[in-house]
UniProtKB/Swiss-Prot annotation:
GO molecular function, one term: G protein-coupled receptor activity
UniProt entry tagged with the keyword Transmembrane: yes
Extracellular compartment spans: 1-23, 78-98, 157-193, 257-267
Family that this chain belongs to: Belongs to the G-protein coupled receptor 1 family.
Known glycosylation sites: 6
Organism, scientific name: Homo sapiens
Gene Ontology annotations for the cellular component aspect, listed alphabetically: plasma membrane
TM region positions: 24-47, 56-77, 99-118, 138-156, 194-217, 234-256, 268-287
Membrane topology: Multi-pass membrane protein
Superkingdom assignment: Eukaryota
Ranges per topology, Cytoplasmic: 48-55, 119-137, 218-233, 288-309
InterPro entries according to UniProt: GPCR_Rhodpsn, GPCR_Rhodpsn_7TM, Olfact_rcpt, Olfactory_Receptors
Name the UniProt record assigns to this protein: Olfactory receptor 4C6
Residue pairs linked by disulfide bridges in the UniProt entry: 95-187
Length: 309
């Protein structure tokens, strides 16, 4: 790869060229990142310590919360450190590494949301067989499959980019190593490669998003036979899941289901996908979930009791 590349590092222009405004953005990112870590870790601790949250849904939610922390950690800390150090450069290897990790966690998230939708489908449409179908072994295999699938997706993206020569310019009009930005900087024809990227990322996002929407439609239609209380509980859970699905997939589809061109709004979509959504997910899952809120209250009471001793 070194023989093909004259470029050894890239310059990231960030969200804005206004230094003072960029400092404000970084401060906001810091607050949001800390909130993301604390919120998601609180959910993980609550689920692990609560005996009432032992269903597969909460098992998957634990991994989704951990994933949100890791996904957000790919972007936010570097943006904050770059601002403090006044450094806006990233090496070619660092750029490709960041790209791989972004798509790895993103791919895992997509598959995990699909698994969670299937879990809700079985719980609502086949309640008598739920414990058999969603056994601990099956749940572990599904989570493992999500991580393997995410790794394969990211590896394909990395292999696409690994062979591209970069000979200048080396300026990326973004705050992260964006896939399409890199393709536009390549000193070779990337038309075919752009189509492959769209197929690997864009088509995958659209296909899975449509499958998820269809799944939740089937689930909602099956609620007619439920009691009013059961219907309300199922609707509350499904609406939370569906909100997270929309927040995750809409930016993904916008960013990758299109020709290899860049737009100013790409930065806002990247902020939404990597910083805002991981922060909102815990709030969405807990605000309408009585079981989680009850478990959090019990956990808080335990902490107060320990602190009082």
């Amino acid at each position: 790869m070194e023989n093909q590349n004259n470029v050894t590092e890239f310059i990231l222009l960030g969200l804005t060229e206004n230094l003072e405004l960029w400092k404000i953005f970084s401060a906001v990112f810091l607050v949001m990142y800390v909130a993301t870590v604390l919120e998601n870790l609180l959910i993980v601790v609550t689920i692990i310590t609560s005996q009432s949250l032992r269903s597969p849904m909460y098992f998957f939610l634990t991994f989704l919360s951990l994933l949100d922390v890791m996904f957000s950690s790919v972007v936010a800390p570097k943006v904050i450190v770059d601002t403090l150090s006044k450094s806006t450069t990233i090496s070619l290897k660092g750029c490709l590494t960041q790209l791989f990790v972004e798509h790895f966690f993103g791919g895992v998230g997509i598959i995990l949301l699909t698994v969670m939708a299937y879990d809700r489908y079985v719980a609502i449409c086949k309640p008598l067989h739920y414990t058999i179908i969603m056994s601990p072994r099956v749940c572990c295999l599904m989570v493992g499959g999500a991580w393997v699938g995410g790794f394969m997706h990211a590896m394909i993206q990395l292999l696409f980019m690994y062979q591209i020569p970069f000979c200048g310019p080396n300026i990326i009009d973004h705050f992260i190593c964006d896939l399409f930005q890199l393709l536009t900087l390549a000193c070779t024809d990337t038309h075919i490669l752009g189509l492959l990227v769209t197929l690997n990322s864009g088509m995958m996002c659209v296909a899975i998003f449509l499958i998820l929407i269809a799944s939740y439609t089937v689930i909602l239609c099956s609620l007619k036979s439920y009691s009013s209380k059961g219907r309300h509980k199922a609707l509350s859970t499904c609406s939370s899941h569906l909100t997270v699905v929309v927040l995750f997939f809409v930016p993904c589809i916008f960013l990758y289901m299109r020709p290899v061109v860049t737009h100013p709004i790409d930065k806002a979509m990247a902020v939404s996908d990597s910083i805002i959504t991981p922060m909102l997910n815990p709030l969405i899952y807990t605000l309408r979930n009585a079981e989680v809120k009850s478990a959090m209250k019990k956990l808080w009471m335990k902490w107060e009791a320990l602190a009082g001793k």
